[in-house]
Amino acid sequence: MSKLKVFCFGFGQVAESFANKLIREKKNFDLNITSRQETHQIDFNSIKINSYQFTNIKFDSSILAKLQEADCILISIPPIEGKDIVANFFDANKKIIINCKWITYLSATSVYGDHKGNWVNENSLTKPTSANGLSRLEAEKTWKNLSNKNNYPLQIFRLAGIYSNEFNILK
């Protein structure tokens, strides 16, 4: 079986959990990620990961080749100053996806705004009230436009607040 080639823009809790799931399921995979630091290799739960520098100012050009090889791409970097730097990167480098089976953009439930305690789902009206919600909704629209224009296999997940032992409202 060939290796699954995974590329993660950002490597926060959700991306780490995804990688840990692949490890637990004994999947044969290569993982490349981005960080704000200079490009380097790290050990993550007994596997080697290449971490490529990616910021709103500069990026390691090796990312382009890795994206062309990627089977799946996970985007967990939030908008910076109201702009999605990953979407801007994709727009500027239009021919980067060749073998990609899916691109997942991690958004947030803040795009729904205040529904006064009523249930919301993916068909609910989006009416964000926070700067975060507004920038996430704008990023979703940008990704949908890129997907339509370039036939990207896009899926958007709207996540609620993520809490753990390290990150929670009580600490």
Segment roles from a protein language model:
Residues 6-11:
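Conserved N-terminal Rossmann-fold NAD(P)-binding element of oxidoreductases
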Residues 32-38, 55-57:
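N-terminal Rossmann-fold cofactor-binding loop
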Residues 34, 103-109, 157-159:
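SDR active-site strand-loop-helix element
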Residues 46, 50-69:
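Conserved Rossmann-fold cofactor-binding substructure of NAD(P)-dependent oxidoreductases
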Residues 66-105:
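NAD(P)-cofactor binding segment of oxidoreductase domains
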Residues 91-131:
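Conserved Rossmann-fold NAD(P)-dependent oxidoreductase catalytic core, especially the SDR/UDP-sugar
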Residues 141-165:
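Conserved beta-loop-beta element that borders a ligand/cofactor-binding pocket
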